[in-house]
Regions:
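Active-site region of the double-stranded beta-helix
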Residues: 104-105, 130, 135-136, 147-156, ...
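Short, structured patches in soluble enzyme cores that scaffold and shape functional sites
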Residues: 113, 128, 145-149, 161, ...
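Non-heme Fe(II)/2-oxoglutarate
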Residues: 2-5, 9, 58-63, 172, ...
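Glycine-rich phosphate/pyrophosphate-binding beta-alpha loops
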Residues: 129-131, 140, 212-217
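Short, surface-exposed loop/helix-turn segments at secondary-structure junctions
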Residues: 128-129, 176-190, 222, 241-248
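Short, conserved beta-strand element in jelly-roll/cupin
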Residues: 134-152, 197-198, 205, 229-233
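Non-heme Fe(II)-dependent double-stranded beta-helix
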Residues: 1-26, 33-126, 132, 171-172, ...
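Double-stranded beta-helix
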Residues: 150-211, 215, 235, 256
């Protein structure tokens, strides 16, 4: 395991302007410039990458995978396996932004995910994350942190503007079917899609019911992304109603009790930070 010198930037506050909060309310997502400086990314990226490949279980070549598994290498809950990854995921900077944008006093960790879209990796089908989560509230948000500048050719995350306010596609798991059905619904609703590149250090936050997608990686460089999912600290676990819920309760939030707070050891409060120290 590589030793990574801790970056104080991860503990420092980032000013969240009222305009950003309003944009999240209206659009369902917001992109924030300069959340991390290049030195912080350069310090943590190698250990995040090492941990992802150490924990990765996908061994099939791209051409033999389903659409979903062509989208990226995905590893969930990396933080228990690396002290450097834990510091990155437990960042007070990221967590306070999440609380400010959600307009709640406190947020806890739901899960982290490394999402590495390989060279030649396919689309990430349209989907809304919260379909997969048995939660009592829609106060959930994900920070999407590219570990390099991300051009359109690499397949940056794209968002259907305002889709979190529409009752569409909320019963569809991420799949070929969700790609077709959600795209048709978005076209019918006339929603704009934001699919711009990300500068190095820029991140995005999106709500659990915001529909998002990514195009293929048409470059010869992996699109390396770390994500952290936050929920209102007062959220409760609801009875599972679809296969994704059952799998998540078993593998992602083990120990969570239906009807109870999501207060397992794997779901610490990250803002305010004293509870996570």
């Amino acid at each position: 395991m590589t030793t990574v010198e801790h970056s104080s930037e991860l503990d420092e506050e980032y000013p969240v302007l009222a305009e950003a909060v309003e944009r999240l309310r209206h659009d369902g997502f917001v992109k924030l410039p300069g959340v991390l400086n290049p030195a912080t990314i350069a310090a943590y990226e190698p250990e995040i990458t090492r941990t992802l490949f150490e924990r990765n279980t996908q061994t099939l070549p791209l051409e033999e995978r389903s659409t979903y598994y062509k989208a990226f290498l995905q590893v969930t809950n990396m933080w228990p396996h690396s002290e450097a990854v834990r510091r990155f995921v437990f960042s007070a900077r990221f967590a306070k932004i999440a609380a400010d944008l959600l307009e709640v006093e406190s947020v806890r960790l739901f899960a982290d995910q490394g999402l590495y879209k390989e060279p030649g990796g396919g689309i990430t089908p349209w989907h809304a994350d919260q379909y997969h989560w048995p939660l009592s509230s829609d106060r959930s948000i994900t920070v999407w942190v590219p570990l390099q500048g991300t051009s359109r050719e690499m397949g940056p995350l794209s968002f259907a503007v305002g889709s979190h306010r529409l009752e569409l596609g909320r019963n569809i798991e991420i799949s070929d079917e969700s790609e077709a059905a959600v795209q048709a619904a978005l076209d019918a609703a006339g929603l704009e899609v934001e699919d711009g590149p990300y500068a190095l250090g820029e991140v995005s936050y999106h709500l659990g019911w915001t529909f998002h997608h990514a195009n293929p990686n048409r470059t010869d460089t992996p699109r390396k992304v770390m994500t952290i999912i936050y929920v209102d600290a007062d959220v409760r676990v609801t009875p599972p109603v679809n296969p994704a819920h059952f799998g998540l309760l078993e593998h992602v939030i083990p120990g969570a009790k239906v009807g109870g707070l999501l207060d397992t050891p794997g779901n610490p409060v990250l803002w305010p930070p004293a509870a996570a120290s």
